[in-house]
Each structure stands twice: as C-alpha cells, then as structure tokens.
Amino acid sequence: MTKRIEERIEGVIESLGYLLYDVSLIKESEQHILRVSLKNPNGAVSLDNCQQVSEIISPLLDVCDFLKDAYILEVSSMGLERTLKTPKHFKLSLGEKVAVKLMNKQSFQAILKDANDLSVDFELENHTIKSVEYKDLKKVKTLFEW
C-alpha cells in the first residue's frame, strides 16, 4: 500500500522542490499514522516546508482513498540520523558519514560514495573504496557529527 501512495505523491512533492525519502504506515494506540519523510536538496526541511507539503498531499490522499481507516498524516524531514533500508535511501544519502554493520559481523564507519540497485560503495578512513552488495548489509545508519 505504501508503494502506491509513494507513486501517487512523489511527483507532486518533487514539483514543490523536495524529494520523497520514505512513506510508512504505522499503528500507534489504535491510531493509523501515515508518515511521509522529505529531503530538501537545497538545505534543511523546515516546519513551513512540511506544512506546505501536507496541505498539498492531504486532499490528494483523501481523493485516492488508499486508506480505508481514518489516519493522521505526518510530514517531516528524513532526519539527521536514520537507518538506510532501500537503494533509494542510499542514493539520497550520498556523501554522508555512516556506521555499517555487515552480515558477517564486521562493522566500520565510512562515507557513502555511490549506490546503485545492487550494491553500495563506501569510502573508508584510509580513502579506499569498499563495495558491498545490499544482501551483505545488516544495518547502515547515518551519523551526525556536531
């Protein structure tokens, strides 16, 4: 279901100058919450940006009737520290510092250099590139440094 929602709102969000990072549907205390995460290619995502996107996509979602139950729409930035799960997440996070845990229990910190649909390239501290297939990744999380 979130894939259909993503397909419907992505073009609208891009027309406003933002990138759609993620869509998730969760249930908290019997309430359905549709979370839409944005990236602003020109800087930070502000509260005004979130409000603008919310006001545009809310009626669109109501008309499409993807969700049968009542829900709360939450629009936010993708966040400074987040877990990368899909090739799209990796592509939208190029150049960021990440903590990587592999399936073989190896872990390291690196800069995310490149990503495609099969693998991702990390620049290690010694400036070498380590290429890893998605299937070999256990967890990758962006790191924010103050």
Swiss-Prot record:
InterPro entries: Ribosome_maturation_RimP (IPR003728), RimP_C (IPR028998), RimP_C_sf (IPR036847), RimP_N (IPR028989), RimP_N_sf (IPR035956). PANTHER family: RIBOSOME MATURATION FACTOR RIMP (PTHR33867:SF1). Required for maturation of 30S ribosomal subunits. It comes from Helicobacter acinonychis (strain Sheeba). Keywords: Cytoplasm, Ribosome biogenesis. It is found in: Cytoplasm. One of its GO terms (biological process) is translation. Gene3D superfamilies: RimP-like superfamily, N-terminal. CDD domains: YlxS_C. Pfam families: DUF150_C, RimP_N. GO terms for cellular component: cytosol. This is Ribosome maturation factor RimP. Belongs to the RimP family. The lineage of its organism: Bacteria, Pseudomonadati, Campylobacterota, Epsilonproteobacteria, Campylobacterales.
